[in-house]
Amino acid sequence: MIERGKFRSLTLVNWNGFFARTFDLDELVTTLSGGNGAGKSTTMAAFVTALIPDLTLLHFRNTTEAGATSGSRDKGLHGKLRAGVCYSVLDVINSRHQRVVVGVRLQQVAGRDRKVDIKPFAIQGLPTSILPTQLLTETLNDRQARVVSLNELKDKLEAMEGVQFKQFNSITEYHSLMFDLGVVARRLRSASDRSKYYRLIEASLYGGISSTITRSLRDYLLPENSGVRKAFQDMEAALRENRMTLEAIRVTQSDRDLFKHLISEATNYVAADYMRHANERRIHLDKALEYRRDLFTSRSQLAAEQYKHVEMARELQEHNGAEGDLEADYQAASDHLNLVQTALRQQEKIERYEADLDELQIRLEEQNEVVAEAADQQEENEARAEAAELEVDELKNQLADYQQALDVQQTRAIQYNQALQALERAKTLCHLPDLTPESADEWLETFQAKEQEATEKMLSLEQKMSVAQTAHSQFEQAYQLVAAINGPLARNEAWDVARELLRDGVNQRHQAEQAQGLRSRLNELEQRLREQQDAERQLAEFCKRQGKRYDIDDLETLHQELEARIASLADSVSNAQEQRMTLRQELEQLQSRTQTLMRRAPIWLAAQNSLNQLCEQSGEQFESGQEVTEYLQQLLEREREAIVERDEVGARKRAIDEEIERLSQPGGSEDPRLNALAERFGGVLLSEIYDDVSLEDAPYFSALYGPSRHAIVVPDLSQVAEQLEGLEDCPEDLYLIEGDPQSFDDSVFSVDELEKAVVVKIADRQWRYSRFPTLPLFGRAARENRIETLHAERESLSERFATLSFDVQKTQRLHQAFSRFIGSHLAVAFEDDPEEEIRKLNSRRGELERALNAHESDNQQNRVQYEQAKEGVSALNRLLPRLNLLADDTLADRVDEIQERLDEAQEAVRFIQQHGNQLAKLEPIVSVLQSDPEQFEQLKEDYAYAQQTQRDARQQAFALAEVVQRRAHFSYSDSAEMLSGNSDLNEKLRQRLQQAESERSRAREAMRSHVAQLNQYNQVLASLKSSYDTKKELLNDLYKELQDIGVRADAGAEERARQRRDELHTQLSNNRSRRNQLEKALTFCEAEMDNLTRKLRKLERDYCEMREQVVSAKAGWCAVMRLVKDNGVERRLHRRELAYLSADELRSMSDKALGALRLAVADNEHLRDVLRISEDPKRPERKIQFFVAVYQHLRERIRQDIIRTDDPVEAIEQMEIELSRLTEELTNREQKLAISSRSVANIIRKTIQREQNRIRMLNQGLQSVSFGQVNSVRLNVNVRETHSTLLDVLSEQHEQHQDLFNSNRLTFSEALAKLYQRLNPQIDMGQRTPQTIGEELLDYRNYLEMEVEVNRGSDGWLRAESGALSTGEAIGTGMSILVMVVQSWEDESRRLRGKDISPCRLLFLDEAARLDARSIATLFELCERLEMQLIIAAPENISPEKGTTYKLVRKVFNNHEHVHVVGLRGFAAPVPEALPGTADAS
């Protein structure tokens, strides 16, 4: 067990009241007891000054200044010192039993600012026999001594053997030594660390719960995970550097692209212009020869055009004269056609209206019959309704009478009276004065027979009435038809006129039937007449063209002569055509072959250029495609070998990277699962415990632990046993060692050390022999040594890999070039030169063109004669079939005769069309016109009389029937019989009344419905009559209009008129077409003559100019060629494939390149000026100068340390290979450097879990601490909700926020800050940058919230605040917090210092009077359990039972102040024991 270091003593030299005083410090509690002003605070101030000699922090205020920051100008230190040199020295024995003396030299600085000068120093190796006061003072005599200066102290110590004296210029160095030697618990690297330490001491000194510490518990208790932050910062710095390098590579690539672009565009700019001038020079020579040839050809063409112009002018004049006559004839034919079409439309209307009239006539007759029947029915309905009405009235009267007489006494009298009334009414109606009730039956039968007879007579008359009405309507219909055909006439004349009309209709129909044949005959004759006239016109025109008058009989002879002439000319023309065709075919073949060669020439030239480049790149000469393919196979083999070697080097480099990454893991854990298991089991990796082992001891410890060097050290194996059940995610062999990770040693094994090996006795029957490894990896030093070796090997491999990658890429590019050549140019690269063959073909083409021109001039005359003869034969072929027509003189008379007969037939057709339907209707009913049915009115009167007779007979029979019915009323047998009879009669009367009323209702309804129907029939009849009259009037008007037109409208009239018009239109169109052709030809001929004239003048002028231009351009071209050859750029500029482009294409190519070059050289003043000068089109040699300047500029920019060539094109090629390799390597490096968000979350979460476990262990040490009502103290650590959400998102939902972490514009810290803002938009980030926020989020301490809680009395656990606790409880709670902080610092710093050092623990407590005895005893117990030293300042009445107590009394003797000190150890013993060395040195 390592002993904890202790403060042995505190020495004050030349302090106020203390000249040279040494306080021996107790191992636990040292109490300074004394009254006010005794020097207790001064003693503690000296101790604190020696611990933290930082004037920016020191501020010794009394307790009345609590919370003040500027109580006095000197902050309490200047007034505690005396003038001169002062010392405050601490004597320490550390865990290694080394004596260390550390302290400060203080001296007041003169001036009103009351400043103090402090110099820290340290002494090592001082013998224990020498006291600090002996070093710091010099005894002058028995009563006097003086304080030595710092230089004197240094000289005194240097004289001692083995003693080291160190004076420090900075507080950081002073504290670094104190940390290394175990004086302070924490390495105080910065002012912030010193401030935390001072605040801790200050809080301990003045007691209570320090708000400064409680607010910053995270900074005090939680260690800064600087390794993680530094790893992230290094990663981001490496990524940033990597991206900057990539950006620089991209800039270099853009520069490379610019150079490549500059070369390409400069070559296009100059080469296009160079080849354009070369082409133009050749073209100008060809044009000069062509102009001279065209000049002679144009002169001959002008003479031929002048002769042609005279002939066409004569023919045009003839056509202009004939056009007027044709236009007049065509207009007359068009007008006649319009009249015929109008007459036909009128005829169609007439036929349509006649059909409508016939239909209306039939409908009108039908409607008249319907109306008559409806009127008869209406009269019958009225009679029935009237009879029904009378019967109902009669029955109602009878029923009313019987109802009135229903009284038993009056009924009989009433009925008897009614019977008498009925008898009288029957006598009156029947004219029978002798009628009695007994004879009524006989008379009833008589009158019923009379009624039957009257009814039969009425029905007979009704039938006769119907027949007469039908005859009357037929007569009227026949009469109307006769009147419609003949016009108005008397009724008695209708029969005679109708017979005459029928006989005339038969004749007219016969003539109408002949009209169609006459019309066909007339059409045929008219067609022949037109053909005759057309043949006469053609004959006249033929004679005009031939210039001679021919008879009809001479035409056949002339036709034979012309055919013979055509045959002879056709043979000559045919032979000429064959000869010309042969020449043209040969010429076309030459041209086709030339075009094929010209299309192939650029391809062949490109193939040759590519082949030359391959030869230059490979250093080989190729004569055939087979040699190229064989060399490609060699390249493939070479590339395969280089790739294999490169991959082997890359695999070795990756293996080294993985090993470096594995060795760089914190704690030496090669398996990340071991870290998780160590946290799970609450243990520490064995490699982490031995992380600080030296390089010399690493082989020993590596062999000592053997396979268990990766074991986990746990406090208790029994607690881990339960967790091992079901454990799967772990290495195959997991070693667990029980022990205290804080004080672990190698005593767990029995070991015998041999030469470079060890024998480990694991058990009585099991030993393990392990040799020292040649490459030990146990401990940080061994791993770092191995990492340095691996880094060196990796650098050499990287250089070899880069060289091999360059060679591979160069071989691949050469392979790609060969592959492109084989795929694109191998088929044509080794063929014959097409340009040589083109020159030969051009020579032969010139010979053929001259032969064709000579042949064309000879063949032209034969062709003209052939065309004239052929035209004459064509005209005769049209005339010869019409010779018979030309000889027929009677054709016109026959046409006139047929025309007259057709007119008569047309009149008959019109009569039949107009009256045919009427005659057809009249013929079957003409017989009814023989007699006029005038007796129809008498028949109507007889029918009305019969109806009246029938009604009278019906009334008489009814009256007699009533008498018969009332016959019982004339004699009654008795009252009962009379009553019964009355009841029966009453019932019968009621039934008859109901029947009569029903009959009356039906009669009325039938009459009403029939009246409405009759009205509808009458309306329809009136509408039909109106329509008939209207259409009749329109038909008459149409007949009148047709007569006014005066044109015969038969079926073929329109066709004949249209045919005539079309023939004239055709003749007019042909004439106009020919005239237009002649005018156009004449205009074209005149224009051609003008063009030829202008062309002659232009050709003469152009020929002279071209000849002068050829001569003048020769001098400039010679200068260009001289400049090109002198600078050796002809190979770059004379691009033969450009010779096959047109001048416009070359000029466009040069202009595009010029525009690109203006942008490319905008930043280069020299090239910009040269380019501007080269734009002069009259000075082509300046473009060559620009090209030479560009190449010179690029040669100067080539880095000879990287690229080994002077050619800019080859330099660009090598730059592309090198940049491609660097880009790929840096991209892979960036992917390796990048860290995932899930890994960040896991690292932070594991760190939080580890620190929570550590705080939990610290809480266990404070569970038994109690002060007053405070039973226990604990520290709560919770993760903030916002930060917990951030960790969850980073680990589980990071895919949703890849836009932040995959962005090249954001570092990981900035992306983390952006994500935090996105998840917590409600939090105001202030003016902090995302980088600052991200760095804070990488610190796990910002994820935690910490607060102190106390278990006080009945309140339970509450937050530790001064207002809720008593003063003593607050002091005790604050002291507990400070103890926890100190212990946390020790745990944090254990890995930073040696394993054999346990630092000193010491705290202060001023004004301990505020604590009771139990609280002070608790402090003593806490100090004993934690091995902590405590210095207490207490008043005189406080005397602890344990520890060392110093009684301080300040005295004044001869105006000289000094403090008298008496030291006592405890008060439990009866006799106090005085400590040695308590006499006052004063």
From Swiss-Prot:
Compositionally biased intervals (Basic and acidic residues): 1056-1065
Pfam hit, one: MukB_hinge
Any Gene Ontology biological process: DNA replication
Cellular component, GO annotation: cytoplasm; nucleoid
Region (Disordered): 1056-1075
Annotated region described as Flexible hinge, given as residue ranges: 666-783
Chain segments annotated as coiled-coil in the UniProt record: 326-472, 507-602, 832-1110, 1209-1265
Major localization class: cytoplasm
Single annotated GO MF: DNA binding
Taxonomy, superkingdom: Bacteria
Record's keyword annotation contains Thylakoid: no
Keywords: ATP-binding, Cell cycle, Cell division, Chromosome partition, Coiled coil, Cytoplasm, DNA condensation, DNA-binding, Nucleotide-binding
InterPro entries per record: MukB (IPR012090), MukB/SMC (IPR050308), MukB_hinge (IPR032520), MukB_hinge_sf (IPR042501), MukB_N_dom (IPR007406), P-loop_NTPase (IPR027417)
Residues at which ATP binds: G34, G35, N36, G37, A38, G39, K40, S41
Location in the cell: Cytoplasm, Nucleoid
UniProt family annotation: Belongs to the SMC family. MukB subfamily.
Job of this protein: Plays a central role in chromosome condensation, segregation and cell cycle progression. Functions as a homodimer, which is essential for chromosome partition. Involved in negative DNA supercoiling in vivo, and by this means organize and compact chromosomes. May achieve or facilitate chromosome segregation by condensation DNA from both sides of a centrally located replisome during cell division.
Entries under HAMAP family matching the protein: MukB (MF_01800)
Subunit structure: Homodimerization via its hinge domain. Binds to DNA via its C-terminal region. Interacts, and probably forms a ternary complex, with MukE and MukF via its C-terminal region. The complex formation is stimulated by calcium or magnesium. Interacts with tubulin-related protein FtsZ.
Record text about domains: The hinge domain, which separates the large intramolecular coiled coil regions, allows the homodimerization, forming a V-shaped homodimer.
UniProt xrefs under PANTHER family: CHROMOSOME PARTITION PROTEIN MUKB, DUF4476 DOMAIN-CONTAINING PROTEIN
Protein's name according to its UniProt entry: Chromosome partition protein MukB
Record gene name: mukB
